[in-house]
Each structure stands twice: as structure tokens, then as C-alpha cells.
Swiss-Prot record:
Sorted UniProt keywords: Ribonucleoprotein, Ribosomal protein
Name this polypeptide is given: Large ribosomal subunit protein uL29
GO terms of molecular function: structural constituent of ribosome
Cellular component GO terms held in the UniProt record: cytosolic large ribosomal subunit
Taxonomic source organism: Limosilactobacillus reuteri (strain DSM 20016) (Lactobacillus reuteri)
Disulphide bridges: none
InterPro entries with a match to the protein in the record: Ribosomal_protein_uL29, Ribosomal_uL29, Ribosomal_uL29_CS, Ribosomal_uL29_sf
Biological process according to GO: translation
Family per similarity comment: Belongs to the universal ribosomal protein uL29 family.
PROSITE patterns: RIBOSOMAL_L29 (PS00579)
């Protein structure tokens, strides 16, 4: 299952790297939305996947914040 492996990978990252990952994902989401608006996006499921990945990163960041 990809999500469990992805979350385990995220748990091993530092806060700075998680913030960088979040920024990259937000940029990717922006580009996907732009492609959708211009009709160039073929795989619309990628929007949902990127949004979920952003949520996973934010969840791990929040968990780390609460554990401090």
C-alpha cells in the first residue's frame, strides 16, 4: 500500500524537509490546476493524489509539532 510507505518515509524526514516537500507539492498542484483549466490535463486523478499527499505531509508536521 503506497500511503503507508509514504507516511513512513515522511515520518523519517526533518521539519525543514517536510516543509520543502509541502512547497513542492503545492507548486505541483498549482501546475495541475492550470493544466486542467487549459484542457491539457489527461490524468485528472493526479489532482486528488497530490491533495492527499499535501494532507499527509501536513499531518506528519502536526504530529511532530505535538510531540515536541
Amino acid at each position: 500500500m503506497k500511503s503507508k510507505d509514504y507516511v513512513q518515509e515522511l515520518n523519517g524526514l526533518t521539519t525543514d524537509k517536510l516543509l520543502d516537500r509541502e512547497k513542492e507539492l503545492k507548486e505541483q498542484l498549482f501546475n495541475l490546476r492550470f493544466q486542467l483549466a487549459t484542457g491539457q490535463l489527461e490524468n485528472t486523478a493526479s489532482l486528488k493524489q497530490v491533495r492527499k499527499d499535501i494532507a499527509r505531509v501536513k499531518t506528519v508536521l502536526r504530529q511532530q509539532e505535538l510531540n515536541k
